[in-house]
Amino acid sequence: MHGALFENMIVMEVLKHRYNQGFSGGVYFYRDSNQNEVDILLKEEGEITAIEVKSSMTYHASFEKTLRQLTNWIKTPVVKRAVVYGGDFENTQSEINLLNYNNLHKLLHA
């Protein structure tokens, strides 16, 4: 239950940010018949920002699995990828950003 509530909180923050910026849509999720899933896809100007949400306080490399595979499943270019989670360690220098949920705004304003 904790994970679902955490994910819902992050989705709501993304939606609030987009609406406050004057965007009326462009927030999606991805799930296919093989149960591959990405929690948030932000589509803007023909490009995608993909976000995986994890309530865990500890980072695991498996958090990035679907973000790495996403380009095999969709045609729209994925320009940014991030894991937003409950832990303190952050990394914004790699192909997939790792952010504490309190710093979600850094991803949304980038």
Give, region by region, the residue ranges found by the protein language model:
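A cross-kingdom feature that marks ATP-driven nucleic-acid transaction machinery
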Residues: M1-A110
